[in-house]
Amino acid sequence: MTRSILCFDIETIPDVEGIKKLGLVPSGLSDEDVVAHITKDRLENGKSEFLPHYLQRVWVIGCLFKDDRGLKISCIEPSNSDSTLEKAGLVKLSSVNDLDEESRIKKFFNIIEKYSPTIISWNGKGFDIPVLNYRAIVYGLSAPRFWDQGESNRDNKFNNYINRYHRKHLDLMDILSNFSSRSFASLDHMARLSGFPGKLGEEGSNVWNQFLSGKEKEVKAYCETDVVNTYLMYLKYLKLTGSVSNEEYQDLISEIKNFI
């Protein structure tokens, strides 16, 4: 395995403020009515109810980080979070404006700045990273190491996070499909077919309703399950490509089982 890896997954909600700013809905609507209105409008015009990437806001970022020191699985917390209050159930997001999205995204890119890990995703190049990039632009964030394609470090010219065919960002869905959208498969289905748990509980399509209900804890658990499944599929990929032996694969599987 590489020196350090970061499996990640994001859960998003509609960018209500962005929708209002662009004049896509009548003024004076509540957050809930904004989303209901634009969803209805899109469906009536033959579009998907799923909003485009640039109209998504990042609510949860789940991460599995592994290096020589071991494993860590968690969701990135905003700078103003108070774990004691959160555990006591005293912190609840009451509106989109309470979401410290900027802090979460900044921390995600800071992990890359500090460790330069190989990042692992399932459809991360198609969804997660474009959303993170758009939101980082909106907030005026800086992520030079993520964007470096050899300008600062010559080695990054040949293996960087941006090039679709490089392995610095390994999008498992993309590479296993041989970069063909006609062959894409869901993480849940492939994980279950491979003998892993797959998704447990909530579906990504239900995140907005979970947000309105203040169920951040449940969505975090759902997101962390996704990153674990992504990591397990990554281990299968390492075995498939001969990057690890069968014995090494079994050791890595035992490690994650014992950790969980």
What are the roles of these predicted feature ranges?
Residues 27-43, 83-84, 100, 215, ...:
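Alpha-helix capping and helix-coil boundary motifs
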